[in-house]
């Protein structure tokens, strides 16, 4: 799931992804957060 959250580092995606899909598994891709629900 790509969410509308700008990022420079994967760690910046942890909280937004936790809020969005309840999972900390994420990656910063092309300046946007990508969340994985493991």
UniProtKB/Swiss-Prot annotation:
Keywords, ordered alphabetically: Disulfide bond, Ion channel impairing toxin, Neurotoxin, Potassium channel impairing toxin, Secreted, Toxin, Voltage-gated potassium channel impairing toxin
Site (Basic residue of the functional dyad): 27
Signal peptide: none
Disulfide bridge positions per record: 7-28, 13-33, 17-35
Gene Ontology cellular-component annotations: extracellular region
Magnesium found in the keyword field: no
Record carries keyword Cell wall biogenesis/degradation: no
Residues of the site described as Aromatic residue of the functional dyad: 36
Tissue expression notes: Expressed by the venom gland.
Compartments, as annotated in UniProt: Secreted
Molecular function in Gene Ontology: ion channel inhibitor activity; potassium channel regulator activity; toxin activity
Reported function: Blocks voltage-gated non-inactivating potassium channels (Kv) and unblocks inactivating potassium channels blocked by alpha-dendrotoxin in synaptosomes. It is not toxic to mice and crustaceans, but has a paralysing effect on crickets.
Misc. remarks from the entry: NTX2 has a thousandfold less affinity than NTX, for the potassium channels (Kv) of synaptosomes. In addition, it shows a lower potency (over two logarithm units) than noxiustoxin (AC P08815) in producing 50% blockade of the probability of opening small conductance calcium-activated potassium (KCa) (obtained from cultured bovine aortic endothelial cells).
Comment, domains: Has the structural arrangement of an alpha-helix connected to a beta-sheet by disulfide bonds (CSalpha/beta). The N-terminus is probably essential for channel affinity.
Family membership noted in the UniProt record: Belongs to the short scorpion toxin superfamily. Potassium channel inhibitor family. Alpha-KTx 02 subfamily.
Protein name (record): Potassium channel toxin alpha-KTx 2.4
């Amino acid at each position: 799931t790509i969410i509308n959250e700008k990022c420079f580092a994967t760690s910046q995606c942890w909280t937004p992804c936790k809020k969005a899909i309840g999972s900390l598994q994420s990656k910063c891709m092309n300046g946007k957060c990508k969340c994985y629900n493991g």
